[in-house]
């Protein structure tokens, strides 16, 4: 498809009193679609309501399931959880530093109230843009700054009458009666006030000539072409205005949109030409893809392919039948090349949400550009490296881009006028905040403790330190499975493993070897069945490559059908120059899978259980999901963990099955210590955007009540509880003099939210790009810990992930929960054996 075809010039909207006048930029739509080339008389081109109305109506709506990204801290999810007795949530411990952020302060806070009106037209006008045009005749009356989405009007001017009646004419000289009904005031304290501010910002950004793709703005004129992979990167911005601790701040993050230059038509042509297989193969490769139509800069999800219709098919438009070929030529000056290609069907999700009506959008394959990356592309190292060279910006590059955006916004006349009309002015400098750097934590080994280091990486200390706990008789009964042709590589791996483990205090004896003569999945599984007859403590499989089917089968046999920890090592690993370093990591994993602990941190609290919880969707059935809970068993006493998994609905965001998992962890703790924990810190990951209120009402309160009941049964007071929501996917960034802040950096002021007990923590070092802080929102706490102790405890918990000898972005229990939930949802698709609950089998 030539570029000029896909980017046909837009024509001005024409007004029409019929329902077909809604056509403005989407393809033709049908309410009931039938596979007939003669056309459906009910089909007509339409346009939805403006994006400004959708922003107001849908801002609080949850999307994307349990692990959706939460860009600016749940933008419209307002829940006041800051304890009344908490005078200050700022800590004092640590070295103070001045940090720069990706926020800009709103210098002149508007001192006005926004007036909300509802507008009706008589006779009725279906097309929102026509409504906007008719009302714009009274711009002077409405005031210099007003927002109108075709139905709702927002302005700073209050009319004297409750209902103000005006008249106006359209471009076709049709006169309309306009009724403007007063709804109410929106004060600065209301969440809707911030929504309006965001709409004002979006309106001001129109002057930057950016394209709206999805919900963010991108600059196609600054696109970066990666021609060898038929791909473009569009730079853009994610923005949000919100009331922070003291000021209203504009958060700005640099983002990129992956735009593939290939179309759905190109993908279809690559599919099998065998008539018996072609349609099925097309559907496998096309369904659920997100596409962009350049003629209206809209994105759609492909829900079906209709092989019964072609661009020659007709539909009813403005009282006559018209083919798709003629429609696109007349509407967009686009000539469709292949008149025999099938049509694509996309459900109009926004329309369905508002009206519960089923409306479908009809699309032409050769006009649909594919967006995003598929699994094959993500596994292409060269492609990902080429992309990251543009998208992975260091702190200086990022701050330069932020300042350039601010300068562009404040020097574009159209943008400046919008902000001035609303009496708004942005600071030209990024917002600064004083943070603190917590001191290095001590890592406790069997024979001593060492500081974690400035970069929070203690890999080198394994040269002279023994792991904290190891089996007294070592790894004495285990098995390996390897192809006969790789016997030499197996010897190399085992020799390196013996040496690495010995230096860390883990004695590994020679395994029972099961040599196989091919590398088929079934051969490995049958060899595992032979292995288990000798009751091994662990099975190691040497495999030729990263075959997903083989890996899943090995894990399922070990964890679902049996209860034997498995370790899968690829042949490529044995040929790595850093084999001894890799062997050290494998030895640590083997020790963990046996149920032992490589290291610990100094923990001042006794009787403490830390819990991590996360959810992962099943890759086999997207309606199903698996929740994983990891709980520590008093790390001051025995440094062990407990894990449990349950199946739940992918839409069960509030995890109604959570309490039984907590109860199992409590029983295990009681079994090991002959008492229940006196303190519980629950780190809740996997919370979807907009669900904090539901989470607090139905999950937190439920846990509190059930803990009271559980402890009352043994005549104990309920434990001290802290419930903390962990958000790892944030757009918030901060920098230290053009560099990444070091691990242990805390921010608990200025950019935090006044209604929350929250803080940001940078807990890990990154070698490339810009570090992303993690947000912690304390929804509930009866712990009695000061803010700095809560922050320090959280940082300590980031030192205990045993797959990596360094800190992690989130507390280890969260990382373990994510790892386990992903393993079950991706590979096992069944609940693992209970006998594995005390072992790190999921590492």
From Swiss-Prot:
Q: How is it modified after translation?
A: Symmetrically dimethylated, most likely by csul. Methylation at Arg-10 enhances binding to papi whereas methylation at Arg-7, Arg-9 or Arg-11 reduces binding affinity to papi. Phosphorylated on serine and tyrosine residues in an Hsp83-dependent manner.
What are the PAZ domain coordinates in residue numbering? 263-372
Q: Where is this region: Interaction with CBX5 and papi?
A: 1-257
Tissue specificity here reads: Expressed in ovaries (at protein level). Expressed somatically in ovariole terminal filament cells, epithelial sheath cells, cap cells and follicle cells (at protein level). Expressed in nurse cells and oocytes in developing egg chambers (at protein level). In embryos, accumulates in pole cells (at protein level). In larval and adult testis, expressed in a germinal proliferative center at the apical tip containing somatic hub cells and mitotically dividing germ stem cells (at protein level).
Q: Which positions does the record annotate as the modified residue Symmetric dimethylarginine?
A: 7, 9-11
In chain numbering, motif Nuclear localization signal lies across: 1-12
The record lists the effect of residue 54 to G as: Confers RNAi insensitivity
- From the UniProt entry, list the residue stretches annotated as the region Disordered: 1-76
Gene inactivation phenotype reads:
Female mutants show normal ovarian development up to third instar larval stage. However, adult mutant ovarioles contain germaria lacking germline cells and containing two normal or abnormal egg chambers as result of the failure of germline stem cell maintenance. In adult testis, results in deregulation of transposon silencing.
Query: Where does the record say this protein resides?
Result: Cytoplasm; Nucleus, Nucleoplasm; Nucleus; Chromosome
Outcome (variant: residue 685 to A): Does not affect nuclear localization, repression activity of soma- and germline-specific transposable elements, fertility and piRNA loading
Q: What is the effect of changing residue 30 to A?
A: Abolishes binding to CBX5. Fails to rescue dominant defects in white reporter silencing produced by the piwi2 mutation
Give the binding site residues for Mg(2+): 589, 843
Query: How does this chain assemble?
Result: In the ovaries, part of a complex composed of at least Panx, nxf2, piwi and Nxt1. The complex is knowns as Panx-induced co-transcriptional silencing (PICTS) complex, Panx-nxf2-dependent TAP/p15 silencing (Pandas complex), SFiNX (silencing factor interacting nuclear export variant) or piwi-Panx-nxf2-p15 (PPNP) complex. Interacts with vas; this interaction is RNA-independent. Interacts with Dcr-1 and Fmr1; these interactions occur in polar granules. Interacts (via N-terminal region) with CBX5 (via chromoshadow domain).
> Its function?
Acts via the piwi-interacting RNA (piRNA) metabolic process, which mediates the repression of transposable elements during meiosis by forming complexes composed of piRNAs and Piwi proteins and governs the methylation and subsequent repression of transposons. Directly binds piRNAs, a class of 24 to 30 nucleotide RNAs that are generated by a Dicer-independent mechanism and are primarily derived from transposons and other repeated sequence elements. In ovarian somatic cells, mediates silencing of transposable elements at the transcriptional level in a mael-dependent manner.
Protein family membership? Belongs to the argonaute family. Piwi subfamily.
In Swiss-Prot or TrEMBL terms, this protein is called Protein piwi
């Amino acid at each position: 498809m030539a570029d000029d075809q896909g980017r046909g010039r837009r024509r001005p909207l024409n007004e029409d009193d019929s329902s077909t006048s809604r056509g403005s930029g989407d393809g033709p739509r049908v309410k009931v679609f039938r596979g007939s080339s003669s056309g459906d008389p009910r089909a007509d081109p339409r346009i939805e309501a403006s994006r400004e109305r959708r922003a107001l109506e849908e801002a609080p709506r949850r999307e994307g399931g349990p692990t959706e990204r939460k860009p600016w801290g749940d933008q419209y999810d307002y829940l006041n959880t800051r304890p009344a007795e908490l005078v200050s949530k700022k800590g004092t411990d640590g070295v103070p530093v001045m940090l720069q952020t990706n926020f800009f302060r709103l210098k002149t806070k508007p001192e006005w109230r926004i007036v909300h009106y509802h507008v009706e037209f008589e006779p009725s006008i279906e097309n929102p843009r026509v409504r906007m045009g008719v009302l714009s005749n009274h711009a002077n009356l409405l005031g210099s700054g007003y927002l109108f989405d075709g139905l709702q009007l927002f302005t700073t001017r209050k009319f004297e009458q409750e209902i103000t009646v005006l008249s106006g004419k359209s471009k076709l000289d049709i006169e309309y009666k306009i009724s403007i009904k007063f709804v109410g005031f929106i004060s600065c304290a209301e969440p809707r006030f911030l929504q309006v501010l965001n709409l004002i910002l979006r309106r001001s950004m129109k002057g930057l000539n950016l394209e709206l793709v999805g919900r963010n703005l991108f600059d196609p004129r600054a696109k970066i072409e990666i021609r060898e992979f038929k791909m473009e990167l569009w730079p853009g911005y994610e923005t949000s205005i919100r009331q922070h601790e003291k000021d209203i701040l504009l958060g700005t993050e640099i983002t990129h949109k992956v735009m593939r230059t290939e179309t759905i038509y190109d993908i279809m042509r690559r599919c099998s030409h065998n008539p018996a297989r072609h349609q099925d193969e097309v559907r496998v490769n096309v369904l659920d893809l997100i596409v962009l139509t350049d003629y209206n800069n809209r994105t759609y999800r492909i829900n079906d392919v209709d092989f019964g219709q072609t661009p020659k098919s007709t539909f009813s438009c403005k009282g006559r039948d018209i083919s798709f070929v003629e429609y696109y030529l007349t509407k967009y000056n686009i000539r469709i090349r292949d008149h025999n290609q099938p049509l694509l069907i996309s459900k109009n999700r926004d329309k369905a949400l508002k009206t519960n009506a089923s409306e479908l959008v009809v699309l032409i394959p050769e006009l649909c550009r594919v967006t995003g990356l598929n699994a094959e592309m993500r596994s292409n190292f060269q492609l990902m490296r080429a992309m990251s060279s543009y998208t992975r910006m260091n702190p200086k590059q990022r701050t330069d881009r932020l300042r350039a955006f601010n300068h562009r916004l404040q020097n574009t006349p159209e943008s400046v006028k919008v902000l001035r009309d609303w009496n708004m002015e942005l600071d030209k400098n990024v917002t600064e905040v004083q943070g603190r750097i917590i001191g290095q934590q001590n890592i406790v080994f069997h024979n001593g403790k060492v500081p974690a280091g400035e970069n929070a990486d203690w890999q080198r200390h394994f040269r002279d330190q023994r792991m904290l706990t190891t089996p007294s008789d070592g790894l004495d009964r285990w098995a390996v499975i390897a192809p006969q042709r790789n016997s030499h590589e197996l010897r190399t791996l085992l020799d390196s493993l013996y040496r690495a483990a010995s230096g860390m205090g883990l004695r590994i004896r020679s395994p029972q070897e099961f040599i196989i003569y091919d590398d088929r999945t079934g051969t490995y599984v049958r060899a595992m069945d032979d292995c288990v007859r000798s009751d091994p403590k662990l099975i190691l499989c040497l495999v030729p490559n990263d075959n997903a089917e083989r890996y899943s089968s090995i894990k399922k046999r070990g964890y679902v059908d049996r209860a034997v920890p498995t370790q899968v090592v690829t042949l490529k690993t044995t040929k790595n120059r850093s084999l001894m370093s890799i062997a050290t990591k494998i030895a640590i994993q083997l020790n963990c899978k046996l149920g032992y602990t490589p290291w610990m941190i100094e923990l001042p609290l006794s009787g403490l259980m830390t819990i991590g919880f996360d959810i992962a969707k099943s890759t086999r059935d997207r309606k199903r999901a698996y929740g994983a809970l990891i709980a520590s068993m008093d790390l001051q006493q025995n440094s062990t963990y407990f894990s449990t998994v349950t199946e739940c609905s992918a839409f069960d965001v509030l995890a109604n099955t959570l309490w039984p998992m907590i109860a199992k962890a409590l029983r295990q703790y009681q079994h090991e210590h002959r008492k229940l924990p006196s303190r519980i810190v629950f780190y809740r990951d996997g919370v979807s955007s907009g669900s904090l209120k539901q989470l607090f009402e139905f999950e937190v309160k439920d846990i509190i009540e059930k803990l009271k009941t559980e402890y009352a049964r043994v005549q104990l007071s309920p434990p001290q509880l802290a419930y903390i929501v962990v958000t790892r996917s944030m757009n918030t960034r901060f920098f230290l003099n053009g560099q990444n802040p070091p691990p242990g950096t805390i921010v608990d002021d200025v950019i935090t939210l006044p209604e929350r007990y929250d803080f940001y923590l940078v807990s890990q070092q990154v070698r490339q790009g810009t570090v992303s802080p993690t947000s912690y929102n304390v929804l509930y706490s009866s712990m009695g810990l000061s803010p700095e102790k809560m922050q320090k405890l959280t940082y300590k918990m980031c030192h205990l992930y045993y797959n990596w000898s360094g800190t992690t972005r989130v507390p280890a229990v969260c990382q373990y929960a994510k790892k386990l939930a992903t393993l079950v949802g991706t590979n096992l698709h069944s609940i693992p054996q209970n006998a594995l609950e005390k072992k790190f089998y999921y590492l």
